[in-house]
Every structure is written in C-alpha cells, then in structure tokens.
Amino acid sequence: MNGPGNKDIIFNDLYLDWSAPVTLVEGVFDAIGAGDNSIPILGSTLRKDSKLFQKIADKGVSVYLALDPDAEKKALHIARSLLEYGIEVYKVDVSPYKDVGEMTKEQFQYRKKKAEIVSNDTFLLQAAQSI
C-alpha cells in the first residue's frame, strides 16, 4: 500500500529525461529491468494529485505503462486518467511474467516496441479484455 508521502515523490527524478517517453512500473526492481527513463510508481496506483502525475501532464511526455498483470484494472484507470490530460499512452504486455523485474532488459525492450497504444477508442475494448 502506498504511504502518505509517496504521492510527493518522483523516484530518480534527477536522472529522467523529461523530453522523452517515460515508462511507469510498480517497483524499483522493475524500473531497473525496464532500463532508462523508467519510473517506479511505488505501488500500483497513480493519483492525479501526485507530483509524478502532475509532472507527466505538465511535460506532455508519452507514457509506457508496464504494471504487473495482477494490476490490470489499475493500469487501465491510470491510462484513462492520462488520456484525459491528452497524454499518449502505450500498454506494455508483461504477461506471463509476474512483473518487469522477471524479464531480461532485452525481453522488456522487445515488448516495449510491441506495446499497444491506448486511445479513447480502444480503451473500452482493452477494459473488456481485462475482465
């Protein structure tokens, strides 16, 4: 569960390139596996009032969502929130792995290249598939 201070933290902010797409993952080890410009959200939720969400919205960078398969509904909620702010969102298929940390960097990069764009048109279809 997210602690009260997590919404005010952007993990590794000083090392992020805010002019390039970012990858959102759940934990620190997932971020290591995902490579450069990856941000652990330190849980499976990203609230609109969090510092990270606000910075993404302010910078307008594309987002690759690579949350654990058991957080599919939460990933779709995050995607919908980002879409409301005009952010381009891609969903990285992590299954059948438990999380990004179980993959090699090469496996993750391959899946990232194959990521599906999430749009208002495809959101309902992807939400239905997650049921």
Feature map (PLM): residue ranges:
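Anionic group-transfer/hydrolysis microenvironments
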Residues: V28, D68-D70
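Low-complexity, compositionally biased segments
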Residues: F11, L16, G33, A71, ...
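Residue-level "edge-of-site" marker
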Residues: S44, P69, S95
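Replication-associated primase and helicase/ATPase modules
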Residues: V22-L24, Q54-A66, A75-I131
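Phosphate-handling DNA/RNA-contact segment within nucleic-acid enzymes
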Residues: M1-V61
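Short, charged/polar "capping" segments at the starts of alpha-helices
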Residues: D49, A71-L76
